């Protein structure tokens, strides 16, 4: 209910065409026009409908289209007036499903975040609840914001590791039924996460390069921390993919061993019954000059009686 109430505040302010605005400082404070200077460095939180108004308030000119539906990657581009970027963040409970899609814009003084899902709003609420130094600078806010949406990913990767270990134990115990249906989604999700972490790492490096000079030189170190964190997550995802492949190879070895056992059993059966098969083949031909043709059945029975003890001994 509390989450729903917070979302209502977010929607109401955006429906009024204002968006939300947080003034940068050690603690993020909602902007109050009556008591705060208009040009104070801020974070504007907007929806697609209020994005243009917020960009105008922040003194940014962006000529591109603002369409969250087109967001498909985490990337950033440098423009003359601002940095423009997008975030495409997998939902932890549905990695392969719909993602949180965000656009953001940065200039020398302000940050504008465009989000129709309230995800950014919830992240800011979490930052305000958990951090004592929430955003005394643009760099510190971006650092807190980006680390917050990957803060649970190491735990998530730990759950994947546990699932793969359980599958490995099953394979070692010969429980291989349903293995392929279990391992394939894990591999696909880990591949998705690895690509996502790679994109976040590249974005951190781009921010650290500070091509437009929008960031203080002493503050760009925060972006290096983001890159390092994403790099570690990407390495962990790669290790888990390799681990999953090793377990898959073990599964294939188990399947091959079972097939070999089946073939050996069938070979033994074929060897045992080969003499009987040979006898029935001979007497099924009915050649004209074949011995015992006139007394075929007694002959076949006699041969069978002679052969059976040998078969039983084998």
Regions found by a protein language model. Give the residues of each.
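Helix-boundary and N-terminal cytosolic regulatory elements
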Residues: 4, 8-133, 199, 203-215
């Amino acid at each position: 209910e509390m989450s729903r109430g917070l979302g209502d505040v977010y929607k109401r302010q955006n429906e009024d065409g204002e968006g939300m605005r947080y003034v940068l400082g050690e603690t993020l404070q909602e902007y109050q026009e009556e008591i705060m200077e208009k040009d104070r460095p801020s974070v504007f939180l907007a929806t697609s409908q209020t994005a243009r108004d917020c960009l105008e308030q922040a003194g940014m000119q962006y000529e591109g289209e603002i369409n969250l539906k087109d967001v498909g990657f985490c990337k950033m581009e440098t423009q003359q007036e601002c940095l423009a970027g997008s975030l495409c963040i997998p939902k932890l409970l549905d990695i392969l499903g719909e993602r949180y899609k965000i656009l953001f814009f940065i200039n020398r003084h302000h940050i504008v975040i465009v989000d129709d899902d309230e995800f950014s709003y919830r992240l800011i609420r979490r930052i305000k609840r958990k951090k004592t130094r929430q955003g005394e600078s643009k760099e510190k806010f971006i650092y807190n914001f980006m680390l917050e949406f990957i803060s649970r990913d190491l735990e998530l990767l730990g759950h994947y590791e546990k699932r793969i270990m359980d599958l490995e134990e099953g394979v070692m115990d010969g429980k291989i039924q349903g293995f392929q249906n279990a391992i394939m989604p894990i591999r696909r999700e880990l591949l998705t996460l690895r690509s996502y972490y790679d994109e976040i790492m590249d974005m951190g490096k781009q921010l650290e390069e500070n091509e437009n000079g929008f960031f203080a030189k002493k503050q760009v170190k925060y972006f290096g921390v983001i890159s390092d964190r994403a790099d570690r997550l990407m390495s962990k995802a790669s290790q888990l993919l390799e681990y999953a492949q090793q377990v898959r190879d073990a599964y294939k070895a188990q399947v091959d061993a079972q097939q070999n056992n089946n073939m050996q059993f069938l070979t033994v059966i074929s060897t045992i019954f080969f003499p009987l098969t040979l006898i029935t083949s001979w007497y099924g031909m009915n050649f004209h000059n074949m011995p015992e043709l006139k007394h075929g059945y007694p002959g076949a029975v006699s041969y069978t009686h002679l052969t059976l003890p040998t078969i039983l001994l084998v």
